[in-house]
Structure formats: C-alpha cells, structure tokens
C-alpha cells in the first residue's frame, strides 16, 4: 500500500474542501478541530495505520478484530450458491459497523464483493477497493455512473443498504427510512437474485433524540451523522446478529407488482428474517 494511505487516510479539512472550497475557507479553525474530535479522526487513522498492510475485505476484518466486535450469522433457508450473482440487501441500523461486518462476512464467502456507498466514504482510501460511490446529495459524476453500471454487470457480489441512511427512531421503534426501489430495478436488469438480510443493533438514545430535534427544527442537513464514528467506538466489545433469508430469484419479480411494491415486499422479508431462522 502506498505511503499516502499509511500516513493519513481520513482528513476532515480535505473532505470539506473537496466538497465545498468556499465553506472550507469560511470555517474557523476551531470548528474544523471540533469536527475532527467529534468524528474521532485520530482514532480512525490510528486504526488504519495499525493495519496499513491490509485493504478491502481484509481491512474490514482486522478493524472488527481490533475493536473486539463479534457477530453471529443465522440462516432461515437455503444459503446463496457460491457460483451465483447476488444483491445482498439489509437494514442499516448502525451506520458503520454493520457495513464492516457485511464486508467481512460476505467477503469471506465470495472472492469479489462491492458495496454501494455514499461517495464521502471514498476518502477512506484503504476500503476503496470494495466501495462503489454514489452521490446521495447531488448529481453523480460520469465516471461514478459508469462504475455503478459496470458493477452490476460484473460477477462481483453486491452489498446494498436500500434506505441509504442509517435507521432512525420511527413511532417509538428503531427502523429504516423508506427503502428505494433501485436495487429491484438493477436486479432485474442485471439478472441477479436478491438476498434479504436483517442486522441487529441500534445507536444511542442521544443519536435518535438529536435526529428528532433536527427534524422538528426543519434542518435538512443530517447533522446527527457526525455522531456515527462516536457510535462505532462506543460499541467496542459488542456482539451482533446477522439474519439471512432465502434468496429471491429475479425471475420472480414479475409485473404483478411495481418495482416499488417489490421493494417494500423484500423489506418485509428482510425484517422477518430475524424470526424465521432454523
């Protein structure tokens, strides 16, 4: 791995400047330093530096080990065929560790995995080999659009959080936001079966209270996401459960339902997987 990756892989100031040079020039130094502490920049870079010889799936596995995070996997039906092409879809309760666990587990069973992620995560360069960036807040760059399409046309297994953002407190329960139908459309187009999964876990009460307050105040920017690195480090030594349901053949996604209706049906299957393990 090159020296640039080993020295510093997350730089808040660089990220802000890359997204909005004008904002970067206006932000006082103490605000940037506060954000660095808030997202645990030094701790994240220490993790990456300690594992400088690893990237992709191996790095995700090493980070879980260093954080003493473990997980148990439960199947409710037949396991995915190692020779198949799949889109693995899951709820998104945590915003960090859930993705790491999916990369580590699915990557240990298939030789090639790709994760559809917010393009901001591409600044974590050692994990870039498994990431496929999408811009959730604006227009996608042409090269990223091409990579997105090429990934679905490839033989790589695809990991996908259809909600995009991590779960929020909805009607008193931690639940995903609305799932987007894109994965259904792409499954049909690329002839991939879909594997519904459910991931246990939730963030702190403060995270959900801040999200609720932000919404009440009419603030559109998801400021609570700045807390996600802290939520990750708070879960050192934790154990989680991953429930994997029966693969859904893309050929079964017929015109009987719209793509959005199929999306909602598969979401229900994902949440039901936790109650159907053998």
Question: Which positions does each model-derived feature cover?
Answer:
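Conserved beta-strand termini and adjacent loop/short-helix elements that scaffold enzyme active sites
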Residues: 74-76, 116-118, 134-135, 245-247
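Short, flexible loop segments at the rims of nucleotide/cofactor-binding pockets, characterized by
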Residues: 63-69, 134-140, 172-173
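Short gly/ser/thr-rich secondary-structure transition/capping motifs
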Residues: 67-74, 140-142, 224-226
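Short, conserved catalytic or adaptor-binding loops enriched in Gly and charged residues
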Residues: 61-65, 124-125, 233-236
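Catalytic core of membrane glycerolipid acyltransferases/transacylases, capturing the structured
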Residues: 41-43, 86-140
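Structural motif corresponding to alpha-helix initiation and N-cap regions
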Residues: 57, 142-145
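Membrane-anchoring hydrophobic helices of lipid-metabolizing enzymes
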Residues: 1-89, 99-101, 110, 128
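Non-catalytic C-terminal accessory region of glycerolipid acyltransferases
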Residues: 2, 12, 145-278
């Amino acid at each position: 791995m090159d020296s640039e990756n080993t020295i510093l892989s997350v730089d808040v100031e660089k990220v802000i400047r890359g997204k909005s040079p004008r904002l970067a020039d206006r932000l006082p130094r103490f605000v940037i330093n506060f954000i660095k502490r808030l997202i645990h920049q030094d701790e994240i870079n220490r993790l990456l530096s300690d594992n400088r010889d690893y990237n992709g799936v191996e790095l995700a596995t090493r980070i879980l080990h260093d954080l003493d995070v473990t997980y148990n996997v439960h199947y409710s039906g037949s396991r995915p065929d190692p020779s198949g092409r799949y889109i693995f879809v899951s709820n998104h309760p945590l915003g960090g560790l859930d993705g790491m666990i999916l990369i580590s587990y699915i990557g240990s069973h298939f030789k090639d995995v790709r994760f559809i992620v917010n393009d901001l995560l591409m600044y974590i360069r050692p994990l870039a080999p498994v990431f496929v960036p999408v811009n959730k807040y604006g227009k996608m760059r042409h090269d990223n659009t091409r990579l997105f399409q090429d990934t679905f046309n490839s033989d790589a297994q695809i990991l996908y959080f259809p909600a995009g953002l991590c779960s929020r407190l909805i009607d008193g329960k931690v639940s995903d936001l609305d799932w987007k139908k894109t994965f259904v459309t792409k499954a049909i187009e690329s002839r991939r079966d879909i594997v519904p999964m459910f991931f246990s876990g939730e963030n702190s009460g403060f995270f959900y209270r801040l999200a609720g307050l932000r919404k009440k105040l009419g603030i559109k920017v998801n400021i609570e996401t700045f807390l996600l690195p802290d939520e990750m480090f708070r879960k050192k030594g934790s154990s989680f459960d991953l429930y994997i349901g029966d693969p859904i053949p893309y050929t079964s996604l017929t015109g009987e339902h719209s793509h959005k209706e199929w999306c909602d049906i598969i979401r229900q299957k994902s949440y039901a997987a936790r109650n159907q393990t053998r």
